[in-house]
Amino acid sequence: LLRRRGLSTAILDADVTGPSIPKAFGVHEQLMATDEGICPAASTTGVKLVSLNLLLENETDPVVWRGPVIAGAVKQFWTDVMWGDVDFMFVDMPPGTGDVPLTVFQSLPVDGILIVTSPQELVGMIVEKAVNMARMMNVPVLGIVENMSYFQCDECGKKHEIFGRSHLDEIAAQCEIPRTARMPLNPALAAACDAGKIEMFDGDWLDELAGEIAAL
């Protein structure tokens, strides 16, 4: 969305053992390295990407690494890649408050985080842990996105809360998170990710949030 606004955008895929970013963007070519460093891949619209999957000989090979090795890879994605001038860089992290988030918060100049959650009440506790960790590390929480928030029927337009009532507003108020957005269960969006055409998908659910972040 920020790339569509003319901003130079990059994604560092820190979900080392479960990287999905390259597939969603339709990028499969292996990364190239020079004496100066690693050259990031580029998507159709020019989003710069770095992911461990773009370094594997076979993208279906598992990554069986312990925490310190994973943390080292994340650091190298920041220090050894020739990112160039970038307006916004997104770091995709795995769920939880483990080695990867700690490494990112300690090793990268993070301006803020966006938390992605789902409607189940149990997830609220996990969100609080993530918020508390960010604030312990003096990282601002910019907003929260509720994924799979509802399903909207194509025929009647009615919204069905498949995974139960949304707790987004309650969590945002309790954790003092200033911005919220909801993402529906959408078969067309899932198909676009599977086909590597996420950039071509036209959905307005995150437009307001993206605009507010771009203005920061």
Report each predicted region and the residues it spans.
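Conserved Switch II/interswitch segment of TRAFAC-class P-loop GTPases
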Residues: G84-V91, T97-G98, P109-A130
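Phosphate-binding/switch loop-helix module in NTP-utilizing enzymes
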Residues: L56-V104
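Phosphate-binding loop that captures ATP/GTP phosphates
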Residues: R5-T60, V64, A71
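Conserved nucleotide-binding/hydrolysis micro-motifs of P-loop NTPases
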Residues: V16-G18, L55-E57, P95-T97, P119-V123, ...
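Gly/Ala-rich phosphate-binding loop of Rossmann-like dinucleotide-binding domains
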Residues: R3, F105
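Glycine-rich phosphate-binding loops of nucleotide-dependent enzymes
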Residues: V50, M93, Q106, L142, ...
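Residue-level signature of catalytic and energy-coupling elements of molecular machines
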Residues: D13, I21, V50, V74, ...
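C-terminal lobe/tail of nucleotide-utilizing enzymes
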Residues: V131-L216
